[in-house]
Amino acid sequence: TYGGYVTVKFDHPVQNKRGSDLRIKGNGFYSSGDPKYGKETIGGSFEPGIVYVGVGDDVNTCKWYELAGSEYYTDEIHDFSITYHKPVAEEGEHSQMFSSFDNYIKWEASWTDKNGERRDSTGYHMKISFHRQSFWPLWEEGETLTFKGGKLPNNAVNYGTEASQNWVLYRYAKDAYGYVDASLNTDDYSTFDIDWAVDEQGNHVDLEEINFVKVVNGTFQYCGWLGETSTEVTGFQDLHLVEGYDENPIIITPRTSTGLSVVKTDSKFAAKDDSYYDLMGRRVATPQKGIYIRNGKKIIFK
């Protein structure tokens, strides 16, 4: 589910050279029976994960940067936070289809929506009857787990009924890039360019090399009998070690950035001598809650 991650370190720094630098494999595949798009489908089983790269000698102290994928500047939520509570039992009351415990793992989430409004939600992950093992990490001694970061849009559609479900999990577009387990392993779109690195404000960062790679499950959605959507990771590869690759590297042209950086602040801290504009380009004398532009940056007043 959202926030689960795997972190790896190569036995050498991965250089940032021309073109894609990494290939990260998942187990995505296309549907052979998409009831809506048929053979033209870009759907199947794709469970996108966000990639972060770390610079430093120690995984606990290194500086992390997100690789901005195709949805970063449009539909990604950048401040999603969720807390999961350790289940009190492995079986319990259940009335939902495919469930062996309806109120299995409690969760509480919060985020800022596109209008700058703070949202929150709470609920439970049910335990799928097909999976008897505990969903909770057995090595975790605490009562809660909290994850924070980017969250990608949901990508699953059920074309069946509640009793006979037919889930298709789509790529965001034919040229969507920047996410693990979101294309075939043989596609160019399963490769990643360190040049896509951005800091916490969404500003481009020039990195000569990276030491760590982290893949984080980027969606928060439940798909009936399939359960929660979870990124699958099956391998990492430094492309520059492939013979002849640097002579003809994979080039993925990133989506055009909005040129805006995100700064979250309270409206009472609005600078009186600065000009603020709404998203229609109109000057605003006194910003209230919402999203504004100041000096080329996106300002979210809460």
Name what the model sees in each region.
Residues P254-M280:
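Residue-level detector of functionally pivotal "anchor" positions at catalytic/ligand-binding pockets or at interdomain
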Residues I50-Y52, S275:
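Beta-strand signatures of extracellular beta-sandwich domains
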Residues V284-Q288:
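Surface-exposed, flexible coil segments in extracellular/virion-facing regions
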Residues T1-E47, G69-T256:
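A domain-level signal for the mature, folded cores of soluble proteins
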Residues N60-L67:
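Tryptophan-centered short beta-strand motifs
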Residues V55-V59:
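Short loop/turn segments immediately following beta-strands, especially the blade-tip
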Residues I291-K302:
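C-terminal tail/sorting-segment detector
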